[in-house]
């Protein structure tokens, strides 16, 4: 493996998933021995004010602007073309030129749909092998450009969608979505139960409640769940300190049945002891669930990639989608009481996992880039 290649990984923090995938690929590059790897949050570096405003609007779309985001997501996918989206095609152009001049990359990897990168090739004539690592279980056309050399996708479904719009089969590889390696490592669960003071003889429900405040009335839900002596509830609030504080009294009263946590670095540990999880259908979280085999209850997916992700998992018997708050409690209690359905869902979601995605992707990218470089040299000499 030629680890002397210079790698530039571009991302954007519209949701944590794109950044997390970039970080995972960076760390895999380091493990493989690459000496020159750079990660750039291109839009943030290019125009911090615009980036922060649009990130704020993006996050708000999860709670108060769902219909606007639905119109944007599906509308752009239908009318997407270069003329109408000329401004987007140029976003980050100056900063990209600076990064290319500074780092002289042999490879560019996108974990966010940045069309400025393949457009850079068209405008300058400079051919830098460019690869898109897609972070959802669906396709949006904004990822697609004739100057992207290869796409790395989660499933055969996404590959089929790319082929339908004219992408050559050799330019698409099904690899899964890169996730942190600890999710694919074996680990005894006994110490984890002990660490969180949970019983292995009772069901564990994990509620990922910190993400953008999407799940409402968490306290009311927990008040009902703790009435069941056979269920232990773990609520991860992330950086949502207000939510954590609002649950503190209930936790104090039900310490053996309710655990309220803030940010959890080793969230994979909780996944290993969880019988089912309530979460939002982000591509990374769902991929992490496939690695360990955690059935998921997906609450009120936002129209767009979340809704498409949720549909994909529900259609394959790996998730239950709940669109009304009053249905959550019934869905959770019914699932936890039904061993056959739990077992089937665990198998179904585990079957969706593709292991070692980051390693597979980087090895293929290196092979593809070397082939492209050889072709370019042969073309010059001919």
Curated annotation (Swiss-Prot):
Signal peptide: none
E.C. number: 2.4.1.315
Disruption phenotype: Cells displayed reduced and abnormal cell size/shape, no effect on flotillin cluster numbers or size.
GO molecular function, one term: 1,2-diacylglycerol 3-glucosyltransferase activity
SUPFAM superfamilies: UDP-Glycosyltransferase/glycogen phosphorylase (SSF53756)
UniProt KW keywords: Carbohydrate metabolism, Cell membrane, Glycosyltransferase, Lipid biosynthesis, Lipid metabolism, Membrane, Transferase
Any Pfam family the entry gives: Glycos_transf_1
GO cellular component terms, semicolon-separated: plasma membrane
Enzymatic reactions: a 1,2-diacyl-3-O-(beta-D-glucopyranosyl)-sn-glycerol + UDP-alpha-D-glucose = a 1,2-diacyl-3-O-(beta-D-Glc-(1->6)-beta-D-Glc)-sn-glycerol + UDP + H(+); a 1,2-diacyl-3-O-(beta-D-Glc-(1->6)-beta-D-Glc)-sn-glycerol + UDP-alpha-D-glucose = a 1,2-diacyl-3-O-(beta-D-Glc-(1->6)-beta-D-Glc-(1->6)-beta-D-Glc)-sn-glycerol + UDP + H(+); a 1,2-diacyl-sn-glycerol + UDP-alpha-D-glucose = a 1,2-diacyl-3-O-(beta-D-glucopyranosyl)-sn-glycerol + UDP + H(+)
Subcellular locations according to the entry: Cell membrane
Broad enzyme group: transferase
GO biological process, one term: lipoteichoic acid biosynthetic process
Pathway listed: Glycolipid metabolism; diglucosyl-diacylglycerol biosynthesis
Protein family (similarity comment): Belongs to the glycosyltransferase 28 family. UgtP subfamily.
Stated role: Processive glucosyltransferase involved in the biosynthesis of both the bilayer- and non-bilayer-forming membrane glucolipids. Is able to successively transfer up to three glucosyl residues to diacylglycerol (DAG), thereby catalyzing the formation of beta-monoglucosyl-DAG (3-O-(beta-D-glucopyranosyl)-1,2-diacyl-sn-glycerol), beta-diglucosyl-DAG (3-O-(beta-D-glucopyranosyl-beta-(1->6)-D-glucopyranosyl)-1,2-diacyl-sn-glycerol) and beta-triglucosyl-DAG (3-O-(beta-D-glucopyranosyl-beta-(1->6)-D-glucopyranosyl-beta-(1->6)-D-glucopyranosyl)-1,2-diacyl-sn-glycerol).
Protein name: Processive diacylglycerol beta-glucosyltransferase
Organism listed in the record: Bacillus subtilis (strain 168)
């Amino acid at each position: 493996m030629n680890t002397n290649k210079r790698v530039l990984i571009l991302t954007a923090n519209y949701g944590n998933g794109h950044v997390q995938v970039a970080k995972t690929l960076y760390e895999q590059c380091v493990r493989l021995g690459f000496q020159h790897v750079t990660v750039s949050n291109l839009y943030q570096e290019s125009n911090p004010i615009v980036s922060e405003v649009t990130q704020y609007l993006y996050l708000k779309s999860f709670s108060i602007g769902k219909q606007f985001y639905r119109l944007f997501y599906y509308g752009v996918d239908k009318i997407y073309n270069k003329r109408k989206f000329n401004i987007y095609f140029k976003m980050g152009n100056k900063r990209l030129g600076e990064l290319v001049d500074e780092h002289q990359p042999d490879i560019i990897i996108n974990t966010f749909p940045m069309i400025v990168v393949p457009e850079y090739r068209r405008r300058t004539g400079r051919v830098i092998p460019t690869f898109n690592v897609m972070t959802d279980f669906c396709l949006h056309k904004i990822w697609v450009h004739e100057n992207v050399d290869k796409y790395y996708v989660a499933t055969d479904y996404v590959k089929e969608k790319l082929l339908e719009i004219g992408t050559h089969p050799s330019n698409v590889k099904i690899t899964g979505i890169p996730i942190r390696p600890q999710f694919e490592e074996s680990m005894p669960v006994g110490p984890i139960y002990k660490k969180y003071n949970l019983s292995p003889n009772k069901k564990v429900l994990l509620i990922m409640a910190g993400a953008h405040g999407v799940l409402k009335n968490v306290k009311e839900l927990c008040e009902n769940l703790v009435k069941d002596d056979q269920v232990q509830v773990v609520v991860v609030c992330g950086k949502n300190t207000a939510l954590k504080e609002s649950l503190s009294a209930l936790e104090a009263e039900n310490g053996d049945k309710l655990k309220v946590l803030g940010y959890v670095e080793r969230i994979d540990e909780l996944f290993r002891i969880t019988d089912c999880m309530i979460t939002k259908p982000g591509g990374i979280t769902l991929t992490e669930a496939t690695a360990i085999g955690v059935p998921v209850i997906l609450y009120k997916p936002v129209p767009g990639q979340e809704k498409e992700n949720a549909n994909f998992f529900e259609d394959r018997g790996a998730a239950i989608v709940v669109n009304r708050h009053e249905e959550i409690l019934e869905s959770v209690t019914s699932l936890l009481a039904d061993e056959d359905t739990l077992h089937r869902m665990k198998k179904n979601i585990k079957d969706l996992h593709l292991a070692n995605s980051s390693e597979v992707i980087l090895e293929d990218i290196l092979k593809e880039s070397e082939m492209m470089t050889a072709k370019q040299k042969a073309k010059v000499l001919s």
